[in-house]
Amino acid sequence: MKTVIEFYLSGDRVYSEREKAINQLHINRGYGELKGKRLFLSLIEAAYLLEKGWIKVLDGERELSFYDVVSLGKKKDEDFDVKYLVYKDLRDRGYIVKSALKFGSHYRVYRKGAEHSDWLVWVVRESQKLSPNDITARARVAHGVRKTMVLAVVDEDGDVVYYKVEWTKF
């Protein structure tokens, strides 16, 4: 992407009204959510695109750095850093990544060009204790909406390992 697109901070997300943002980022690459003539990005999406040099984020007159956006994200969500690492890893692999909060997970993951997502991804730290009930509930929801539940485990070095969780019938 040649031209850096301006976005403006608005609460816990950023937006742009530029047609180029809508065309290049939303329509062509699956970023953000379109509401009227505005493209809204989550702070995780904004951090990713800032790190790639595709956008800049303004808070009034002040331009925010990647670290500023991550810091804002961590104020809203203490796990922002690990969720960002998983988001970045999936995007770098060519997948489209959207929120899955309504499904009790962190991300819905689509193959490029797919209309429906294949996976629901739940992000955890390697040191985090997991309840069997949490895993079962998420796997049940994923199964109910015909998705595969994936556990994304981030270790202390920031490496991500993915585990597929599915029902087995005997």
From Swiss-Prot:
SUPFAM superfamilies: tRNA-intron endonuclease catalytic domain-like, tRNA-intron endonuclease N-terminal domain-like. GO terms for molecular function: lyase activity; nucleic acid binding; tRNA-intron endonuclease activity. Endonuclease that removes tRNA introns. Cleaves pre-tRNA at the 5'- and 3'-splice sites to release the intron. The products are an intron and two tRNA half-molecules bearing 2',3' cyclic phosphate and 5'-OH termini. Recognizes a pseudosymmetric substrate in which 2 bulged loops of 3 bases are separated by a stem of 4 bp. GO terms for biological process: tRNA-type intron splice site recognition and cleavage. Its EC number is 4.6.1.16. This is tRNA-splicing endonuclease. Belongs to the tRNA-intron endonuclease family. Archaeal short subfamily. Transmembrane segments: none annotated. It catalyses: pretRNA = a 3'-half-tRNA molecule with a 5'-OH end + a 5'-half-tRNA molecule with a 2',3'-cyclic phosphate end + an intron with a 2',3'-cyclic phosphate and a 5'-hydroxyl terminus. Keywords: Lyase, tRNA processing. InterPro entries: tRNA_endonuc-like_dom_sf, tRNA_intron_Endo_cat-like_sf, tRNA_intron_Endonuc_cat-like, tRNA_intron_Endonuc_N, tRNA_intron_Endonuc_N_sf, tRNA_splic, tRNA_splic_arch_short. It comes from Pyrococcus furiosus (strain ATCC 43587 / DSM 3638 / JCM 8422 / Vc1). It is an enzyme of class 4 (lyase). The active site is at Y110, H116, K147. HAMAP family: EndA_short (MF_01833). The lineage of its organism: Archaea, Methanobacteriati, Methanobacteriota, Thermococci, Thermococcales. Homotetramer; although the tetramer contains four active sites, only two participate in the cleavage. Therefore, it should be considered as a dimer of dimers.
